[in-house]
């Protein structure tokens, strides 16, 4: 009886350990998903740090990095920009609203706290360190599949 009781206890302990391991795994997965969810402010800042570094390396992010662009920009905006490029080309870079950029735009990026209304957010981004070089951009962001993405950019 003692031997059977020990087997039962050992089996029960294994089941409890397995259950605890599964619960811990679910908790970790849930925490990772929450940690990956970016606010509009974080998404805008991450996008502009990556985008400006790409421009500084003479890359065309829209053409050369479609996967990364799709992480930060809505499908509709990407399609619209490609359509415009195919017709007459873009006369200025849509995301900086300029034909060229200042050196400090790649290193000095400020994101003002967004105004969020449901699945839309208004975010202001400042590029540049000085009043002479600073450019303010007004972004409209849309929650797309749980992620905040840029759907419009204009001068602020």
Positions of PLM-derived features:
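Extracytoplasmic/periplasmic, Sec-exported soluble proteins
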Residues: 36-40, 57, 61, 113, ...
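Structured segments of extracytoplasmic/periplasmic soluble domains
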Residues: 46, 50-58, 71-76, 80, ...
């Amino acid at each position: 009886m003692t031997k059977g009781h020990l087997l039962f206890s050992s089996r029960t302990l294994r089941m409890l350990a397995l259950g605890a391991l599964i619960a811990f795994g679910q908790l970790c997965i849930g925490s990772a998903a929450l940690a990956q969810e970016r606010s509009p402010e974080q998404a805008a800042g991450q996008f502009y740090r990556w985008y400006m570094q790409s421009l500084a390396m003479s890359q065309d992010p829209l053409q050369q990095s479609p996967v990364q662009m799709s992480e930060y920009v809505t499908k509709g905006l990407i399609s619209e920009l490609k359509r415009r490029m195919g017709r007459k080309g873009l006369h200025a870079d849509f995301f900086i609203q300029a034909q060229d950029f200042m050196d400090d735009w790649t290193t000095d990026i400020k994101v003002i706290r967004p105004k969020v209304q449901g699945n839309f957010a208004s975010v202001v981004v400042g590029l540049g360190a000085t009043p002479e070089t600073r450019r303010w951009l007004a972004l409209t962001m849309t929650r797309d599949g749980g992620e905040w993405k840029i759907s419009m950019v204009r001068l602020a």
